[in-house]
Structure formats: C-alpha cells, structure tokens
Amino acid sequence: MQVRNILVALVVVCFAVSEAATQAPTSPPDSSASAEQVAQLLNAPSELDRLKLLKDNQFVFDFKNSKLGVTQSAGGKTVATSRTDFPAVIGHNIAMTVGFIEACGINLPHTHPRATEINFIAKGRFQAGFFLENQATFIGHILEEGMATVFPQGAIHFEINLECEPAMFVAAFNNEDPGVQTTASSFFGLPADVAAVSLNISSIQTVEDLAKYLPHNPAIAMKECMQRCGMTGSSESSESSEDSSCSD
C-alpha cells in the first residue's frame, strides 16, 4: 500500500510539472513603488519595519523583460534599477544597471555623481576606460568575458562592444541613487556662449548646430568596427526612449 501511495504521488507531481511547463510564461513581476511607499521606506525606523512595507515581488527585478528604467537606442539598451523601480534596494546603498549592447555599440561617456561602479563583463568583449580629474591620465582596458573593472565616483567613463554580435555588462553601484550624467549632452546643455568659449568657438550658432548631431544612448560606435563587422548605414543613433534614466 505504501509503495502504491508513493507511485500515485509521483504521477500527480509529474502531471503538475507537465501542466506548469505548458502554461504561458508569466509576465515580469511588477516591483515598482509609489512615491508614498518610497517615502515610507526611506523613513522607516528599522530594517524590520522596512521589510514589512515591501511585498515579496518587490524583491525581484527582471532586467531582461522590464519596461522600467530602460534607455534604448540604435546601440542597444541599458536597464537600471532605482528606488521607485526596485524599492528593495532602499537602505542598502546598492544599485545595478545591465547593459545589452548591440554589435559595435557604445554606452556613451558619462559619470555617476554619487557612486563608484564595478563593471562585470557577462558576455562579449568591451573596450572601457575612464578619466578621473584634471592632471590625471586616461585609464583604458580591453575587457574579456568574465573580467571586471572599477570606475571611481564622478569619473567620465564608457564601454564599447568590440564584437560583431550583442554583448552584455553588469554594473553595480555603492549608492541606491547613483545618478547619471551623459557628458556630451550635459556639456551642450550649458548656455551656448559658455560652451562656445570652452571650445574656443566664436559662433554660438556653431555650438547650437553641433548639439543637434549628438547621438542618443546607447549609440553605434566607431566606423572601423562597423566596417569590420560588415555593418551598413549611418553610425548616428535614433532617439532614445528615456534619456534621463540611470543608465550606466
């Protein structure tokens, strides 16, 4: 009788597994939080109180399928967590961005004003580098799959996919609100006369014209890479979906 019961139980389990396998894949969990919940989490008197404010699904963020925190253009997309998109990070001084970069794509030069970054190459091969401050020298690397590098807080840095197929990096931060400032677009966001003086250009119109040609992030990188990979078309990027998001 005991053997029979075990066999019946196995049949039931196998049937349940089979049924689950045939069901449509579930949609990514909605981990987002309202401004009110974020404020409550920030002001929680203890970690236990903060834990009670979160739902189970708010501890999971689906980088692959998320529609939150996405910046997308011709060179791929970056998906970044934030307090409102992934409230489980609140109080832990951590954040993350995953870059899904197309062949010859570049995550344009940018800074994180409030965080140091450690960047891990999950797939592919990247050229990466940073410039920290005046009188420093540029530091650059070729990073293979499985390697990592550090970008100090506030340093201008970038990542270029050197391969002819999509690649991926994972960037972690020591601040749940690292911020991001894309270098070129921020510079040309200054008053045109200030930008003109900085570039030693006399014509404000020239500065305004240059600003019109700035690519959106992530962009398609060097022509050499495009030629090597047999890619055709302009390296100019199309409009990004969310320029202000916290891309790496």
Swiss-Prot record:
Note: Spherulin is a major encystment-specific protein.
Matches recorded under SMART domains: Cupin_1
InterPro entries xref list: Cupin_1 (IPR006045), Germin (IPR001929), Germin_Mn-BS (IPR019780), RmlC-like_jellyroll (IPR014710), RmlC_Cupin_sf (IPR011051)
Signal peptide range: 1-20
Species per Swiss-Prot/TrEMBL record: Physarum polycephalum
Glycosylation site positions: 200
A GO term for molecular function: manganese ion binding
This protein's name: Spherulin-1B
Domain Cupin type-1: 61-207
Cellular compartment(s): Secreted, Cell wall
UniProt keyword annotations, A-Z: Cell wall, Glycoprotein, Manganese, Metal-binding, Secreted, Signal
Organism classification: Eukaryota, Amoebozoa, Evosea, Eumycetozoa, Myxogastria
Top-level taxonomic group: Eukaryota
